[in-house]
């Protein structure tokens, strides 16, 4: 048995059974070890951003880490953007990064780099295997760090540690520390503060507090204590749809966000951070609440958020029978016809969404109406990029489909963002994943046109336009998808889009719709 075999055994002993990979020469012993472990599902990504993004989507839907396999520093660097999104989503992930043999590093071969320096900003934990004898403690430490609390870990595996001989052992399960107990003193303080600020209290939820069972508790608190419930701008995962309490999403634009929060005197955070502006703008605030708004943390990431909400509900006197408002029927919206628009797509997808679907939203500006409509759709899970790094949508949908093969995955994807990791379509085809990708083909970086206005530039010239528009030539998404092995078709009318969506939802995927808007 060599170190690579033992590393596989540690992962499998702890139910890490999927490895998203783009290996190179330094990882060949680990690839050979994986070949001897049929219990491990190995999924190839043709670009490392697909690998890390898929691991993110998988983790969000399972609350468990997958492994990734990346080739030295440059391979890791190619995957950093979606590691950033995963870190912001607080997704558990174990990145295995191969490196040169330890004795080869002083020779400064072409692929030698500072892997620790590259990994650290996008990881919650970074470790290096010191040798074959260190495989078990290092791998167990990486696994433990990925879940307590959940986050991104990176384990560097030198080639000589992978090929070095080790004694044959059977690794056991890593014992994880339970989440910290609810702090009842904090609960009491927040309950008193809620009572002292009637009708002027907000609560921001994320993580486990955005799951259906926790949202039911927050719904009762909201209706029984006049607390306004919010979600963050970027949502890692939220369970939405008819019958579920629907938090109001804090808007992305600073002016709209500050207006929404202007009357809040007390903001309670449940697994969330205080909302701040995405960027700094001249003359606009960075904090979105008033300076005199009191901000209190009920429970942080890694704590038992549902238990904290239950304790708070009891402390403010909310009965389990307290009713709350939840969407029960789709609003009376006319069926649109003629030229396809982003609103028509949002309305059609929300109406037709299958029960228990998973929506991965990276449509950026084009699908903003969908989130509001999704409260009235069939019950589903909703996810989006959380770190502002584009190129996560197609990989995230890929990972979610592997995590939940019995559920339909809908990827709402901007054309500009999709091009960052278009290779993920090939993985969907190879793995026969049930994903419907809807490309919002507006042939521009629309969000950046808006950002130009946000900084005071209302009219742009030819140079700026050439950096912000995606025409001359226009992207042919049908051809791109077919080249990756994914069936695809184009729609430019509402009628054509509805017909294609009905067809795509009626059979297993993958399928791509280029929606020209």
Each model region followed by its residue ranges:
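Short acidic loop-to-helix transition motifs that present clustered carboxylates
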Residues: 27, 48-53, 76, 366-368, ...
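Thiamine diphosphate
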Residues: 96, 104-111, 369-517
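Short, well-ordered beta-to-alpha junction loops that form the rim of enzyme active sites
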Residues: 157-160, 206-207, 232, 362-366, ...
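Active-site diphosphate/adenylate-binding microenvironment
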Residues: 3-8, 12-17, 22-25, 30-37, ...
């Amino acid at each position: 048995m060599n170190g690579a075999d033992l590393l596989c055994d540690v992962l499998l002993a702890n139910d890490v059974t999927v490895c998203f990979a783009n290996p190179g020469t330094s990882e060949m012993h680990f690839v050979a070890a994986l070949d001897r472990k049929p219990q491990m599902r190995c999924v190839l990504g043709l670009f490392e951003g697909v690998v890390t993004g898929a691991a993110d989507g998988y983790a969000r839907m399972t609350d468990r880490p997958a492994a990734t396999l990346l080739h030295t520093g440059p391979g890791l660097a190619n995957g950093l953007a979606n590691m950033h999104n995963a870190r912001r989503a607080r997704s558990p992930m174990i990145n295995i990064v191969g490196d040169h043999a330890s004795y080869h590093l002083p020779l400064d071969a072409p692929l030698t780099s500072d892997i620790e320096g590259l990994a650290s900003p996008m990881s919650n934990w970074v470790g290096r295997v010191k040798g074959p004898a260190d495989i078990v403690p290092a791998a167990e430490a990486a696994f433990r760090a990925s879940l307590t609390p959940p986050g991104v870990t990176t384990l560097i595996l030198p080639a000589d540690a992978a090929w070095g001989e080790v004694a044959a052992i059977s690794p056991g399960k890593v014992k994880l520390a339970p989440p910290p107990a609810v702090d009842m003193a904090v609960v009491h303080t927040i309950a008193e503060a809620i009572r002292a600020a009637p009708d002027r209290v907000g609560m921001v939820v994320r993580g486990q507090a955005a799951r259906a069972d926790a949202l039911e508790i927050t719904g009762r608190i909201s209706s029984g204590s006049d607390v306004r419930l919010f979600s963050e701008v970027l949502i890692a995962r939220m369970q939405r749809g008819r019958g579920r309490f629907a938090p109001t999403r804090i808007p992305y634009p600073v002016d709209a966000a500050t207006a929404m929060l202007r009357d809040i005197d007390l903001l309670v955070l449940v697994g969330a951070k205080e909302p701040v502006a995405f960027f700094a703008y001249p003359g606009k605030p960075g904090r979105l609440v008033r300076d005199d708004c009191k901000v209190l943390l009920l429970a942080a990431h890694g704590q038992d958020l549902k238990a904290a909400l239950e304790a708070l509900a009891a402390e403010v006197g909310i009965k389990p029978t307290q009713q709350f408002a939840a969407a029960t029927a789709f609003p009376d919206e006319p069926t649109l016809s003629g030229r396809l628009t982003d609103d028509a797509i949002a309305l059609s997808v929300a109406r037709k969404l299958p029960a228990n679907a998973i929506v991965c939203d990276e449509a950026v500006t084009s699908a903003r109406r969908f989130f509001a409509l999704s409260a009235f759709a069939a019950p589903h899970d909703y996810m989006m990029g959380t770190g502002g790094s584009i190129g996560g949508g197609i990989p995230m949908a890929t990972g979610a489909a592997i995590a939940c093969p019995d559920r339909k995955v809908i990827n709402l994807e901007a054309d500009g963002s999709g091009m960052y990791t278009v290779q993920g379509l090939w993985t969907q085809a190879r793995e026969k994943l049930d994903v419907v990708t809807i490309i919002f083909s507006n042939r521009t970086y629309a969000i950046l046109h808006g950002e130009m206005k946000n900084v005071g530039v209302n009219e742009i010239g030819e140079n700026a336009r050439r950096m912000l528009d995606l025409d001359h030539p226009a992207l042919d998404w049908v051809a791109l998808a077919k080249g990756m092995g994914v069936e695809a078709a184009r729609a430019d009318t509402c009628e054509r889009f509805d017909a294609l969506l009905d067809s795509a939802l009626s059979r297993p995927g993958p399928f791509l719709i280029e929606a020209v808007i």
